[in-house]
Amino acid sequence: MGVWLKNGMSFNKDGELMRTHIKIEHGTIAAILYEQPLEANEEDVIDVGGRLIVPGLIDLHVHLREPGGEAKETIETGTLAAAKGGFTTVAAMPNTNPAPDRKEQMEWLQARIRETARVNVLPYAAITIGQKGEELTDFAALKEAGAFAFTDDGVGVQSAGMMFEAMKQAAALDMAIVAHCEDDTLTNGGAVHDGEFARRYGLRGIPSVCEAVHIARDVLLAEAAGCHYHVCHISTKESVRVVRDAKRAGIRVTAEVTPHHLLLCDEDIPGLDANYKMNPPLRSREDRDALIEGLLDGTIDFIATDHAPHTAAEKAKGIEAAPFGIVGLETAFPLLYTHFVKTGVFTLKQLVDWLTIKPAQCFGLKAGRLAVGAPADIAVIDLETEEAIDPETFASKGKNTPFAGWVCQGWPVMTFVGGTLVWEKGRA
């Protein structure tokens, strides 16, 4: 029989926002009607009341912490947070304990995902054993076990020779290398950006060059290896310039940016609050402006949250001792919609694309589009209601956000994965 989502608004193939009815059947989108009346039995209809219907959002950079970090997050709680944020596909980073660095561990992780995940989870495999940068993992075995791509996110692969070999192996398997870009000899042991905030409080700063020089090295290695190379959480104007030049040279490089690096700079940190501590750190206003420009001109391909939950006790240690990272799955769309679409910096279509079809295209995913035959991974979003961000209402175990109290519009109200309603606002 199927179910109709009635009276929504969505973008057609020409990018026009139109009144829409969508039929879900057998886990896929069976029909789409634009600007037409709907004749269907009442029991087979969900009236979404004029709200926005978009492809389920895609986040290719999240930390679900399981195994080993279950006090911070689990696959179940993290994917419930994803569903609450309108995300139907997330890619899980491998900095867990143990890391998915061998076939058996990847198989365990896949089984755990099947048992507990609320949304689609794409597991990354580690580039090196234990993410220690000393010995490459067995790429072929990990791909066979279901690895999505390879990364040592959380640390940069310091050896150029090891990264080059990793890229050659990944290219032979038609897999991507996804990189946290940071030259450890240049990080200075810092906790924040090497800028005015660091100087004001006498803190050691992380210079911009430690990221940009790593990207510059890697894009040349990727060119030589013929590998798809993806830059995680780009944060500096120099990095944007390197990626832009690499793309112009025809190198197969893609890049992501986080909501927090688009929204904040180090000038916005209110004292020594560890909820503003992440890696890469909040950079200068010039850097933030370059990130926005890079996203708009296509240098940066899409947005990813780098959702990184920690316990309250960990974040209470202070800005120097606390771990890096903030949560982002439940706040990404409302923050970006309110502060960029409502202000005219981005169009609604651009924002939706950067969170759906753009990451899907970069990594060859079937998700990210509303089309007949596509997976029925769908989010319904209320663009009108204003609500303040309240960490105590988060589904994530992590409450570590710098955005508490920010008033936003653009809140997801329903999320479907494979045609199944996995989260609805107001329902337990």
Curated annotation (Swiss-Prot):
Could you name the active-site residues? D306
Q: What CDD domains is this protein classified in?
A: DHOase_IIa
Q: Which residues bind substrate?
A: H63, L64, R65, N95, N279, H310, F324, G325
GO biological process: any one?
A: purine nucleobase catabolic process
- Enzyme class name: hydrolase
Q: Which UniProt keywords apply?
A: Hydrolase, Metal-binding, Pyrimidine biosynthesis, Zinc
On whether Hydrolase is a keyword of this UniProt record, the answer is yes
Q: What is its EC number?
A: 3.5.2.3
Spell out the disulfide connections: none
The highest taxon in the source lineage is Bacteria
Keyword Transcription regulation present in the record's keywords: the answer is no
One GO CC term, this protein = cytoplasm
Q: Which cofactor does it need?
A: Zn(2+)
This enzyme catalyses: (S)-dihydroorotate + H2O = N-carbamoyl-L-aspartate + H(+)
Detail which positions bind Zn(2+) 1: H61, H63, D153, D306
**Note on how the cofactor is bound:** Binds 2 Zn(2+) ions per subunit.
* Any one Pfam family match given in the protein's UniProt record, by short name: DHOase
Spell out the molecular function terms from Gene Ontology: allantoinase activity; dihydroorotase activity; zinc ion binding
The pathway to which it is assigned is: Pyrimidine metabolism; UMP biosynthesis via de novo pathway; (S)-dihydroorotate from bicarbonate: step 3/3
Quick one: which residues bind Zn(2+) 2? D153, H180, H233
Q: Which InterPro entries match?
A: DHOase (IPR004722), DHOase/Allantoinase_Hydrolase (IPR050138), DHOase_bac (IPR024403), Dihydroorotase_CS (IPR002195), Metal-dep_hydrolase_composite (IPR011059), Metal_Hydrolase (IPR032466)
Q: Which PANTHER family match?
A: ALLANTOINASE
* Family per similarity comment: Belongs to the metallo-dependent hydrolases superfamily. DHOase family. Class I DHOase subfamily.
* Chain's role: Catalyzes the reversible cyclization of carbamoyl aspartate to dihydroorotate.
Could you tell me what this protein is called?
A: Dihydroorotase
The record lists the organism as Geobacillus kaustophilus (strain HTA426)
- Gene encoding this polypeptide? pyrC
